């Protein structure tokens, strides 16, 4: 059957490991979005870096193929609501930051919708299989939510969290009302 191919890394590590300012910034972002380790942040940064690299390449490409690729890039970024402008330009893509991608993670959206009290609890609910997107259980906190899926996030029907009087659920809704 042959050897399975070796998959490449999906992230790039920082060039220098001990820059205090970068470490502090990463720590704040990790706490705000409930990331477990820096690798999750680096994956999102690499994804953003790839979008920006593609935009820089397309700025210099004035052919019709370059125009088609720019439209495709805009469609992907609009599908995930990373780019929210009506008439996007490549400059809008270049001005994106890491928080625009982190806001579209399932973990962040579950917390923002009030299905969990904290980002860490949102992560726990997702990993334990209590959250469904379009009726399908999703156990990946880093799953990027498209605009179409935004309103279809709910508790799994056979989960104990689906009950209105579950202790964790009532605590989350009572804090939301205050």
Curated annotation (Swiss-Prot):
Gene3D superfamilies: RNA-binding S4 domain (3.10.290.10). Keywords: Ribonucleoprotein, Ribosomal protein, RNA-binding, rRNA-binding. One of its GO terms (molecular function) is rRNA binding. One of its GO terms (cellular component) is small ribosomal subunit. SUPFAM superfamilies: Alpha-L RNA-binding motif. InterPro entries: Ribosomal_uS4, Ribosomal_uS4_arc, Ribosomal_uS4_CS, Ribosomal_uS4_euk/arc, Ribosomal_uS4_N, S4_RNA-bd, S4_RNA-bd_sf. Residues 104-166 form the S4 RNA-binding domain. Residues 158-178 are annotated as: Disordered. GO terms for biological process: ribosomal small subunit biogenesis; translation. One of the primary rRNA binding proteins, it binds directly to 16S rRNA where it nucleates assembly of the body of the 30S subunit. With S5 and S12 plays an important role in translational accuracy. Belongs to the universal ribosomal protein uS4 family. Part of the 30S ribosomal subunit. Contacts protein S5. The interaction surface between S4 and S5 is involved in control of translational fidelity. This is Small ribosomal subunit protein uS4. It comes from Methanococcus maripaludis (strain DSM 14266 / JCM 13030 / NBRC 101832 / S2 / LL).
């Amino acid at each position: 059957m042959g050897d399975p191919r070796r998959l490449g890394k999906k992230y790039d590590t920082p060039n220098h490991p001990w820059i205090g300012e970068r470490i502090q910034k990463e720590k704040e972002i990790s706490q705000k979005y409930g990331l477990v380790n820096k690798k999750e942040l680096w994956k999102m940064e690499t994804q953003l870096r790839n979008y920006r690299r593609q935009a820089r390449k397309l700025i210099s490409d004035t052919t019709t193929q370059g125009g088609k690729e720019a439209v495709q890039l805009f469609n992907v970024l609009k599908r995930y609501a990373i780019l929210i402008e009506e008439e996007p330009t490549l400059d809008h893509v270049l001005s994106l930051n890491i928080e625009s991608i982190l806001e579209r993670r399932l973990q962040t959206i579950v917390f923002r919708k009030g299905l969990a009290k904290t980002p860490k609890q949102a992560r726990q609910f997702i990993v334990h299989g209590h959250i469904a997107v379009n009726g399908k259980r999703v156990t990946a906190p880093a799953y990027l939510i498209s605009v179409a899926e935004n309103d279809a996030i709910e508790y799994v029907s056979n989960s104990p969290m689906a009950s209105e009087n579950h202790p964790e659920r009532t605590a989350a809704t009572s804090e939301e009302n205050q």
